[in-house]
Amino acid sequence: MTYEIEKLENDIYVVFEKGKKWRHPAKAITAAFDTETLTYIDGKIKSNRYIFNKLKGCTDNEKRQRLRCDVWAWQCYDEQNGFFMTNNFDTFVTYHALAGYKHVWCYNATFDFAQIDYKILVESKEKWRQHKRKDENSKAYNKSQPWTYESLHNAEGARYSYKLWIPYRDPVNRHKHVHACDYRDFMKILPGGLERLLSELDVEDADGNKIRKLKMDYQNVKVEKLTQDELNYCCNDVKGLYFAIKKFDKTVKEQTGNECSIFGNGTNIMTAGGLAKAELLRSMYPLEKNKRDRVKKYQKDHPVSEAQDKFFRKTYLYRGAICTLNKKYKGKLLTKKLFKRKMNRYDVNSEYPFAMDSIEDLIGKPLTMTMQYYLANKKEYKKDYEVIFLCNHITGFLRDGMIATWYDCRLKEYVETIEEDYRHCIFEDELDEYEKWYDLDYSVEKVILYKKGQYVFRNFVRNNFEKKNKAKRENLVALSKFSKLQLNSSYGKLAERIEKKTGHYEENPETGCVHFVEDETETSTSSMLSVVVGSKITSFARCYILSKIREICGCDKNGKSLVAEKFVYIDTDSIHAFADYNGDAFKLGELKCEAECEAVKYIMPKTYIDIVSIENGIVKSYEIHSKGLATTIVTKKLQQYKKLTLKRIDKIFNYGQKFLTLQAMNVRGGKVLIPVEKYLARPECAEDLYLESGYNGMFLNER
């Protein structure tokens, strides 16, 4: 591609495709944008290694005093106008107003929105101000407010949209206008990284040329003299993102009957969860005209009040998945030689969709009664009602041959001995499953019953499951991603919180950087579905995976469970055990064997290494999981050794081992990635290791 560079006053430059008129762009609706930055330390551009050495031992505020971020490129792309880039934010957004952009997508708003934050909230804070609605309770915008903004985000730092109201003068009639432009994050729909996205979607431009991620040395860019390769890199990123969005939008429209869109005038989707929720409700209420009517119909069928929602959350009815490690094997290198067999890693085929498929809907208002009355009429109620116990006291002791799988919601840990003296709502079916793991005793304050309805999720689940299988057979990547998105993102929206912490971004006067300030908690029931139904789905999934662990591990000839001997690890839908299982791997809800491992080492939940292949004592293939640390960093360390042995892995993949990684930080100018050292697992995490007699801290098979 050939570019033209035009220098403006105040050291501003613009880069655009040759032949395009950037001052009079054609009208477009959708575009893609990105930013490129340089990181300065003490006013100089240095390598990551230099920055790491200089900042070692500094506090975060000391780091912020020495670091600065400079956005040297604000770039965007649309088909009508091609590539545009500038080093000036006002020039950039004015171009968007002239081009009539309504929706501009970035990839990973954590960084791109942070650069906008700094421009608006620090550098130009006298000009920009918070946008005000027409009145306090109105959702309508006041379109005549130039240089205003509105950010949609949550208290955990997730960024969803940034809306800007930008003044501009029509280049033809010279009339003044204010244009509203909405910036969104495509990563909230399809995560995984832009490089992977371009490859997997097989993204092509309008002429059929493939677009793939290019390489650039970020800290060695000479802004005053950009090379052709550097310009190509900048253009390629936004061009690739644009055509990826356009390609995926075609699938979205096809699969939703044109009700949902991420491209063009009809754009109405911001996140994967929002898309999945819209489609789930459409499958349940096909006769209703729109999403709003479907939500109202759902709320009529599932009348959960604000007080009931808060009650069930406060009493822990809604909980997440199980993730725990058999403490007997924590921190030890387990080998095929010791167990005389490989360790198998099984995954449930679409666990949460299977749970949705398996449960009956819970409808109407709840019934409440005493435990005594329920037990006297259990046969009558159990058939037609889902039963919840509100317990005020639960105790339990682990049964012989089992491991701790009961999560104490106050202690926030899995316990072998249960001693709960607080109110805890739990489904009766889940208590029945835990009776097989623990010797339980509990007192019930009251019994809550919900009427069972139809299997309302089956159509949605099975249609998308079949689409996923079809996409796999026919290599339809966009359809595969769409169906997976539907299956994996829908259940969580059923129990979406109605209470949300709010806050705003502002300049921190102490550091000169932008930071987040919490305001208050807002409650909105307008789009609330049912925390009870969402809780039943997660409860069913927990019960199912626990029952599968028992089934896989089996019992000895005396009936004693072998879970404590064979089981290693569970994470949500994944079971790791020295045990065999035969089932239909392609069936919804069945287990499929993802790997057979020669050796494994699990040092913490979500931090482990599975060694798949060993030849003549040399490790040939392995899979790493490392919470809070990119697996590529650990892999790079292991790849330094031409002959990677189990002994070497045992030493490197261990407590107290540090790795150099990149961490996001708000600094003056925006947000940057700075090099820091992080533990794979902190040394104190090894303090509770279960040491068998004779264990020497290295290999179980070398005792």
Model-derived segments and spans:
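Short, polar loop/linker segments at the starts of domains and inter-domain junctions
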Residues: 44-58
